[in-house]
Amino acid sequence: MLARNDDTSSYLLVKPVTKKEIYSNDLENGNVKRGASTHSLYLIGDPKFCRNNSSKQKSIIILCGPTASGKSYLGHELAKAYNGEIINIDSMQVYKEIPIITASPPKSYKTEILYHLYNFLSMTEDFSVIKYLKLATEKIKEITDRGKLPILIGGTGLYINSLVFGYNNIPDISEDLREQVRNLHAKIGNIELWGKLEKLDPLAASKINQNDTQRLIRAYEVFMQTNKSIFSFQTLPKEQILPDFNFKIIFLNPERKFLYKTCDERLDKIFKEGAIDEIALIKKQFAPKDYTNWKAVGIKEILAYLNGNLTLDEALNAAQIRTRQYAKRQVTWFKNQIQDKITLEYTNQEEFTQTLKKPFKTI
């Protein structure tokens, strides 16, 4: 496993060294074969990485990366090694009705480590980045006040970007207006709503695809609430969330062929271990308007199976394809949008799991 600091393009062991030096040193010591990846997370350089008492700034770890990359396992091991607690930073794992389809951490993990902001919200409740930031900052401060290390795990780029770099403070949308806009969309659909947006806010319409339902509705309701384009708020200074904290971002970046394999295997396991029954239950509990915007991969495909539009194999295959596409977008986003990060690269499961068996001595 390679640990790369993206600021310096160097690979980190006990001290920053070049990739060439890593292979040279390890070959001399007999640790690795030529061309093999280097060892493990415990060799990542900064001794103060996880120690909240070593400086005035308190540390926060953010463990990010594509779906099915091993974030939950790695985060759990870090929490055990460094007296940490886990905070969710995934927009779908907040919902209590769908722990299986969203691959939320297993109950066995939660008996060992405290987990926060997982599976607590009803699918019928509105949630937003602003609401997430409020809850997450409260949990971060509670955890550090207890002398523990906050470890945030997830793949929702908007949440991560807003927490680390700040956010544009768009006024809250009233519940009445939100309901009106959603009812309007249900009645007229994307194309006609986009046409209305174009007349009111041509800037937003020029930047939003007609098929992007979530962004389309959001832009329309923001204009109706504020009489301003949603994009006008992006020119304002961002409001910093946690200026007194030091963020350490670890990006898991598996080799693509291996990542796609783990995506397929995860979906297959999820389908076999209760996802069908889970989605069948919420299909009975909620009206269709309540779940049309649910974005978790697999929900739409399982609904199509339950409605008789796809066979089970077809639904699984469709969900696997969409998961791989989503994972690819996540990798691209994290590579391009988060510059100050440590990147962990690995090519197979054995390399990932074996390297993590060593102690995390110098993180």
Curated annotation (Swiss-Prot):
EC main group: transferase
Q: Which UniProt keywords apply?
A: ATP-binding, Magnesium, Nucleotide-binding, Transferase, tRNA processing
According to its UniProt record, which cofactors does this protein need? Answer: Mg(2+)
Q: Which GO terms describe its biological process?
A: tRNA modification
Q: Which Pfam families match?
A: IPPT (PF01715)
Give me the residues that bind substrate, please. Answer: T67, A68, S69, G70, K71, S72
Gene Ontology MF annotations: ATP binding; tRNA dimethylallyltransferase activity
Q: Which reaction does it catalyse?
A: adenosine(37) in tRNA + dimethylallyl diphosphate = N(6)-dimethylallyladenosine(37) in tRNA + diphosphate
- Report residue spans for region: Interaction with substrate tRNA: 90-93, 214-218
Q: What is its EC number?
A: 2.5.1.75
Q: Give the residues the record marks as binding ATP.
A: G65, P66, T67, A68, S69, G70, K71, S72
Q: Where is this site: Interaction with substrate tRNA?
A: T156, R178
Its function, per the record, reads: Catalyzes the transfer of a dimethylallyl group onto the adenine at position 37 in tRNAs that read codons beginning with uridine, leading to the formation of N6-(dimethylallyl)adenosine (i(6)A).
> Subunit structure, per the record?
Monomer.
Query: Which family does the record claim for this protein?
Result: Belongs to the IPP transferase family.
Q: Output this protein's name.
A: tRNA dimethylallyltransferase
Q: Which organism is it from?
A: Rickettsia massiliae (strain Mtu5)
